[in-house]
């Protein structure tokens, strides 16, 4: 079985062409082992590219804990790059994921712009914002972000009574300019900080606009692994035409 490794701003994934249904999807232990950074290949998640009757392909995403999970923005961008490598698409595509249809384009510099699901509800609280951008996200400001204990503080909120057993991804934010924010994200399913989170970057951009921290509809999000751009339209409290833009790079391929 051939495996491909991709990364998008440091968020890394194992890709498998599963159009012939060769991968044992119910083998949680295998997914865990492949994603293990000491005993396997190492990745934040594993993604299967499968056939779909009405779109170019289907995305099936698993966290590194071996469980199928909700939408992954960086993973979606990497899967678009993978589909191009497999000659399934050229420079634009429509595919289906767990949260519905996604459109994407690839520019001349191999930067991928991925349309995310509309956000119709943003829950604003005193010291945090909660919203779903294909995956659930808690967004709050943090002082001294570079030295912040993301793993421990993120786990406290993720496992708190606030979100119950299902949990949430947790984003800690620092504003660096009127249109730029730095974030660090604790991802459920990985149960650790990741170098980047696409749905988290998207959630942060929308949360900052919804709370009046920025007036822009084009926001730069600096993550540990690089830079992402988020753009959207807003009408009252509804956000549409949301696009997550950034690099997605092939790392290597191997056979097991």
UniProtKB/Swiss-Prot annotation:
Q: Drop me one GO molecular function for this one.
A: diaminopimelate epimerase activity
- Which GO BP annotation is one of this protein's? lysine biosynthetic process via diaminopimelate
One Pfam family matching this protein: DAP_epimerase
The answer on whether this UniProt entry bears the keyword Cytoplasm reads yes
Protein family: Belongs to the diaminopimelate epimerase family.
PANTHER family reported in the protein's UniProt record:
DIAMINOPIMELATE EPIMERASE, DIAMINOPIMELATE EPIMERASE, CHLOROPLASTIC
Q: How does it assemble?
A: Homodimer.
**Protein name per UniProt:** Diaminopimelate epimerase
Report the source organism: Flavobacterium psychrophilum (strain ATCC 49511 / DSM 21280 / CIP 103535 / JIP02/86)
